């Protein structure tokens, strides 16, 4: 799985015949046509090219080699006739889900994503994927589809235009696309596009005319925030590629922190009276000590939300913060904790580059955002359950519900979703 992370790039960085292993400036200057994973770069014999040192990677092929067979200048019609599938090397039928692939790999990827299929490799998760072996290991075939940049969200939401993030919202820099900025920008845009519905509208939709949220709306809003966290995680880069047991472990550990971040993002009203009422109506009358304890927990919750709101965190920053929280190697029983840690580092790097680009006059902003994360755990997950979810699901643990949502494939089909707060 580490191969998937180290090679992932923004789909916009790919061009016909791109090298899935990562762009090389010399190879880009030399190549004239497509090449799948593991292929040599090809160049037309006698065609003008950027001068290169003999032996330099990506140097033009000598006459008589395969490199001078049927190639034309980059971008010519002749060159495009030889575009190969970036997954298996077969003849490409066009660009599908962000990459040039054959019909077989296109159909396989579409079927795997739409049915949310989970495969198992019987070898070492590094099986060769080419025309002759592509059907032997579905796990490694899907891994390679994702490695070369095929986009899950393009399958789930139909045909999509090429990703062109709004410069004011997602773009990090307008510099050299090989310096990593395009990758970071694309990663953040995919995190944002994974949001199942606009979080920022929840609070205003549930508010009453007196600006106090009624008890009847509290559990509905809380359920939406929880469902939003799970659906978002299921659609962000890298998380769906993890083993289902790892997905469950990560969300069971971090759901309450994601809930607090979503509550802050949507400006969830946290008034003491209706929260106490929501916590007490389903149980026996609370003693004075218990009321004081609950008020303390509500105050801690309020403080965390207010501190985030005071930073005026934007949607891209919230997405990065949630990814940093989610990809934690602290979860128990992870199959590859080092891989999870590397995903957290990538999310942190994306946030750092974004903040430096968008808020150059706030040099301490990145540090302030990171410092907010450890304190999220001061909000007790059991108290969140008691305040917001017991009316909805009774004594069923949230961890059990999260597992059920992941195994069912969608929280929108989750049976509790139809329960109305009353």
Swiss-Prot record:
The family this protein is said to belong to: Belongs to the nuclear hormone receptor family. NR2 subfamily.
Xref: Gene3D superfamilies: Erythroid Transcription Factor GATA-1, subunit A (3.30.50.10), Retinoid X Receptor (1.10.565.10)
Key words, A-Z: Activator, DNA-binding, Metal-binding, Nucleus, Receptor, Repressor, Transcription, Transcription regulation, Zinc, Zinc-finger
Domain (NR LBD) ranges: 183-409
Keyword Metal-binding among UniProt keywords: yes
Mitochondrion listed as a keyword: no
First and last residues of each zinc finger (NR C4-type): 85-105, 121-145
Record gene name: Nr2f1
Annotated region described as Disordered, given as residue ranges: 1-80
Low complexity bias (residue ranges): 39-66
DNA-binding region: 82-157
UniProt region (Important for dimerization), positions on chain: 343-422
Biological processes per GO annotation: cerebral cortex regionalization; forebrain development; interneuron migration; negative regulation of transcription by RNA polymerase II; neuron migration; positive regulation of miRNA transcription; regulation of gene expression
Cited function: Coup (chicken ovalbumin upstream promoter) transcription factor binds to the ovalbumin promoter and, in conjunction with another protein (S300-II) stimulates initiation of transcription. Binds to both direct repeats and palindromes of the 5'-AGGTCA-3' motif. Represses transcriptional activity of LHCG.
Record's subcellular location: Nucleus
Leader peptide range in chain numbering: none
Known partners and oligomeric status: Binds DNA as dimer; homodimer and probable heterodimer with NR2F6. Interacts with GTF2B; this interaction is direct. Interacts with COPS2.
CDD domains in alphabetical order: NR_DBD_COUP_TF, NR_LBD_COUP-TF
Major subcellular site: nucleus
The protein's name in its UniProt record: COUP transcription factor 1
A Gene Ontology term for the protein's cellular component: nucleus
UniProt GO MF annotations: DNA-binding transcription factor activity; sequence-specific DNA binding; zinc ion binding
